[in-house]
Amino acid sequence: MAALWLLLLVLSLHCMGAGGFVAHVESTCVLDDAGTPQDFTYCVSFNKDLLACWDPIVGKIVPCEFGVLYPLAENFSRILNKEESLLQRLQNGLPDCASHTQPFWNALTHRTRPPSVRVAQTTPFNTREPVMLACYVWGFYPADVTITWMKNGQLVPSHSNKEKTAQPNGDWTYQTVSYLALTPSYGDVYTCVVQHSGTSEPIRGDWTPGLSPIQTVKVSVSAATLGLGFIIFCVGFFRWRKSHSSSYTPLSGSTYPEGRH
């Protein structure tokens, strides 16, 4: 390993310039769903260009650059292949992957996180229906999730038990969205049902349509008529009170001279 670091240092110093240069070593372990290592890679790069990589078939480090840097990659590989300790470590790369990853594999991959669900109306696309709903599902792990649409408690046939392809958020959680085009009627209830291993019960999000344009006009006219009638009633009532208070009011006692009845 000392020879490798010395080579990288010499390479960087020799090519130093105003733009800067970077030489780095990268090793990766490719694991399957059960956490079993399937592949091991070890590569040396210069300015993000691969120079040399470990080849498990031939048991050596071979050049990966066949352009202008090929002579450098070839010399680099020849020098590294003289390091017996490095070659021995690379030959044990796959078993080492298993020993290094298993202690924390279950804690990372066997965990679950339930999704958050929200249903909202969105702009319709690729449909003649006037309304489109979007069921947003996010923040869940693992990625497998099933989304079902229901109308008034009944499954919508074209959207029953659909497994969605989730997109990673970059924080070990996923997100996805399901769309439903429809022609709503007043009183309908649309429900997005999300099933995920992170929760024992399905998570539901409901949406109900508002009043139709005709119903909106009817309600507006009724409200305006009611308001106008109330105003007329108030005006008439106050005028009646005013006229009643200005009329003749009889006084107690006799208004005639004494002796007359």
Curated annotation (Swiss-Prot):
Q: Where is the signal peptide?
A: 1-18
Q: Which cysteines are joined by disulfide bonds?
A: C29-C97, C43-C53, C135-C192
* Glycosylated position list: N75
Membrane-topology descriptor: Single-pass type I membrane protein
Query: What does the record list as GO biological process?
Result: adaptive immune response; antigen processing and presentation; antigen processing and presentation of exogenous peptide antigen via MHC class II; chaperone cofactor-dependent protein refolding; peptide antigen assembly with MHC class II protein complex
GO CC annotation terms, alphabetical: late endosome membrane; lysosomal membrane; MHC class II protein complex
Name all Ig-like C1-type domain ranges. Answer: 114-204
- Gene Ontology MF terms: MHC class II protein complex binding
Keyword flag Cell membrane: no
Chain residue ranges for the region called Beta-1: 19-112
Lumenal topological domain residue ranges: 19-218
Q: Where in the cell is it found?
A: Late endosome membrane; Lysosome membrane
The record's listing under PANTHER family reads: HLA CLASS II HISTOCOMPATIBILITY ANTIGEN, DM BETA CHAIN, MHC CLASS II-RELATED
Per the record, the similarity remark reads:
Belongs to the MHC class II family.
Function field:
Plays a critical role in catalyzing the release of class II-associated invariant chain peptide (CLIP) from newly synthesized MHC class II molecules and freeing the peptide binding site for acquisition of antigenic peptides.
Name of this chain's protein: Class II histocompatibility antigen, M beta 1 chain
Q: Which species does the entry assign this protein to? A: Mus musculus (Mouse)
